[in-house]
């Protein structure tokens, strides 16, 4: 007896994100996946006419942003380096754009900003960009 094609859990999560995006629950999604699923994920987004951006994360993972074009245009300007190197302000904007709990984002921002201020005496140009 032939076993039916079963989607890996990662791809089921992706399909749920696509469903939520199409239903208007989300305007933008950030999904981290194993590189081996890149072709499947991109093919699925393209078949649904959903815009996306791919950002490498290490050697075997990818960040896949997808959603409204105006959101992705902002992502192209904000996320110009790995996520762990974003400034507290960039991190806050990204989390807010992704629809994360606003109070949790505010708390995270204050924690990161205070850590940064404590590390570099208020001069958070380059030394503290990787505070996370």
Outline where the language-model segments fall.
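Domain-length accessory/inserted modules outside core catalytic folds
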Residues: 1-132
């Amino acid at each position: 007896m032939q076993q039916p094609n079963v989607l890996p859990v990662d791809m089921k999560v992706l399909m749920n994100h696509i469903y939520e995006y199409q239903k208007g629950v989300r305007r933008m999604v950030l999904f981290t996946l194993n590189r081996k699923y890149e072709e499947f994920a991109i093919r699925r987004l393209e078949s649904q006419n959903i815009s996306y951006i791919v950002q490498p994360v290490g050697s075997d993972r990818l960040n896949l942003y997808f959603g409204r074009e105006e959101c992705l245009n902002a992502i192209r300007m904000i996320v110009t380096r790995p996520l762990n190197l974003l400034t507290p302000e960039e991190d806050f904007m990204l989390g807010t754009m992704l629809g994360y709990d606003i109070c949790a984002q505010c708390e995270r921002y204050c924690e990161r900003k205070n850590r940064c201020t404590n590390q570099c005496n208020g001069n958070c140009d380059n030394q503290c960009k990787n505070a996370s």
